[in-house]
């Protein structure tokens, strides 16, 4: 009788635990595991129990973020058996991350708009190294591996961004394991430096084109003009829709609108998130300074350098990468940078003018397209 009673109680406890897990635990604490076997390269089925409990949270398109920070948009289809299947774009994700038969993928739901962080393990159960370096030659991403930016045990650190190719190259060359005799192979080193320089130049060119012309305005919204990368350009109807989204912007605060490029969230690349000359000139001035970014819905603040050069104005560096990573930004997100303004008495008169207090502070509101329309992320 005692054993039966214990068994019954355990069953009730398990049901209660299941309910608490799916209904009350934070979404970003939920995971599922998939072994890559059979014909895994063309599609992947989401476990039924996970899919059923996330009904309404998984949209027609999901974003998969690999360990490198690269993000893939994957289409979601329904099978004849009623299962959710990742299909359009899945093959590109598999090929891009070198996923092989026998590998195991751990998916962690990020809690926002059908986005998952993915860890990739080999058949031995060890995490694979190569997915950490997608889009690089294997060294830039290492600076953001476990413990690196927090002064981990291996003694590595994130090299600061240095103006000029020579300073940037010097810091990259010195990024070695303190207790290791291995160094970067010469051929890879040449490729790495050329890639970093090319990324710096290309990103700058794209941002200059985006920000060079006067941005379109809707009320206090400043929109960037079209750039060279067509997929990141906002159409007129997009701007109108964004202007209608009920974003909690304080009256009188100017807002700059920027579409996030893949290079803006790729931590292994040097890039600048461009700000239009009109907005920068009117509100931020021609001085390089630190800007504080905040998220009203999440709390916390991030200190991000604002650079002002001859052809480029915008955010850059480790501060921006930290902000993008902590807030799980993905390519094609739309960020609304709301500059917090206060009233100040104009010198020599009773009129009042609007300015930012102490240092520039911006509240960032993030929009993401879900099922064909822009929604505000919390």
From Swiss-Prot:
Residues 140-159 are annotated as: Disordered. GO terms for molecular function: DNA binding. One of its GO terms (cellular component) is nucleus. Signal peptide: none annotated. It comes from the Eukaryota. InterPro entries: B3_DNA-bd, DNA-bd_pseudobarrel_sf, REM16-like. Residues 29-124, 256-370 bind DNA. Keywords: DNA-binding, Nucleus, Repeat, Transcription, Transcription regulation. It is found in: Nucleus. This is B3 domain-containing protein Os03g0622200.
